[in-house]
Amino acid sequence: ANTILMNCAECEPLLKLHRQLLEKHAYEIMKTFHMVQETVGASEAIIGIKKSYVQTVNALKQHIEEFPGMRIHLLDEVYPMGDEVVLIYEATGRVVRPGGLPIEQGVAVFNVETLYNIYQAVEKKEPVTAKYVSVVAEVNHPVTVKVPLGCTMDDVVAQAGGTTVKDPVYFIGGPMMGRIGKGSDPVTKTTNAILVLPKDHLIVQKKMRTSAIDLKRAASICCQCNTCTDLCPRNNLGHPIDPARFMRAASNQDFRDVNPYINASFCSSCGVCE
């Protein structure tokens, strides 16, 4: 890779884990990022961060001159900026081909927590046995906590003072791309956030719907305005995915042209077209 990229663009609403971690440990993470740059022989190291994260940006600016070859790239507050394919284009102008990998464009992407874990391993000889998790929404004290890997979601929510609704549903991840979980589910290396929501919340109801219901709704509601395709982040990068054509074909069970179905495999599941 000739370019390495740090992803500090929280992809979803309500998530603050990476910006908080980077603000608190700016020097340590930047030092590790520079070490990775030297190790892989990259000529450029870019910190991609949303311009709205003012406190974190200020923390980075205090140390940026200490690391030659590293720069801060300020990003707009739009969704899904944290998608690495979108981030790569915004920060470097390079387009990852449909179904391709960033390394094909000479780019390697690291998230903030991964770099902090590298710092812990290299500088302190500590293995990864814990995870930072944000607990938000219907809890008494929204908080980001460090918890052991393998502990239950109930254990984590308890660190936020418990829930404020009678029948809570644990939504693992962000509101756009997350999934419904159980209180007994373990924290894993990919657990970034727990949203506690009432069971009648729109987001919960949407996740519980079947694809058959979604297709019937699309067939009855779609007015062929093409806005879903106009907003599709992958389509805007030139990828062949076309949500409008796919929904039109699927809702009418039209299989004469299979390309809309094949190209749907390039979907990033961001949910913008919903």
Regions found by a protein language model. Name each.
Residues 1-90, 256-274:
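Iron-sulfur-cluster electron-transfer modules
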Residues 9-10, 27, 34-42, 62-69, ...:
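Generic secondary-structure signature for well-ordered alpha-helical cores
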Residues 22, 26-29, 53, 57, ...:
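Generic structural signal for well-ordered, non-membrane alpha-helical segments
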Residues 197-219, 229, 235-274:
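Ferredoxin-type iron-sulfur electron-transfer modules in oxidoreductases and energy-metabolism complexes
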Residues 41-153, 159-166, 174:
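Hydrophobic alpha-helical positions that pack around
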Residues 50, 104-108, 142-147, 218-223, ...:
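Hydrophobic alpha-helical scaffolding
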Residues 47, 167-168, 242, 260:
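Residue-level detector of family-conserved "landmark" positions at structurally sensitive sites
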Residues 1-4, 8-29, 124-140, 145-164, ...:
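Conserved mixed alpha/beta catalytic, RNA-binding, or beta-rich assembly cores of soluble enzyme
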